[in-house]
Amino acid sequence: MTKSELMVRLAEVFAAKNGTHLLAKDVEYSVKVLVDTMTRSLARGQRIEIRGFGSFDLNHRPARIGRNPKTGERVEVPEKHVPHFKPGKELRERVDLALKENAN
């Protein structure tokens, strides 16, 4: 699902549940604020936990020596922090159940 598809789906669910249609620009802004807020929190080293869904954290990757795949030359890869998502129990169970039902 792309960000655009997510925005369309959010508007559909909101309309079905509340009978009110949201403007596309309002849904787009809401998604943008959510993503920007999460990005800034991770950039400050903060952990994000959404109960029932999962948590976002940072993993540290130490510096290492890699290889340029084209030339085979050794290259120093600097240390970095990368975002990591750990799905929550409820999300794992719902995905597993849905995939099992679709397989039958």
Curated annotation (Swiss-Prot):
PROSITE patterns: HISTONE_LIKE. Keywords: DNA recombination, DNA-binding, Transcription, Transcription regulation, Translation regulation. GO terms for biological process: DNA recombination; regulation of DNA-templated transcription; regulation of translation. NCBIfam families: hip (TIGR00988), PRK00199.1 (NF001222). One of its GO terms (cellular component) is chromosome. The gene is ihfB. This protein is one of the two subunits of integration host factor, a specific DNA-binding protein that functions in genetic recombination as well as in transcriptional and translational control. It holds the Pfam family Bac_DNA_binding. This is Integration host factor subunit beta. SMART domains: BHL. InterPro entries: Hist_DNA-bd, Histone-like_DNA-bd_CS, IHF-like_DNA-bd_dom_sf, IHF_beta. One of its GO terms (molecular function) is structural constituent of chromatin. Heterodimer of an alpha and a beta chain. Belongs to the bacterial histone-like protein family. It comes from the Bacteria.
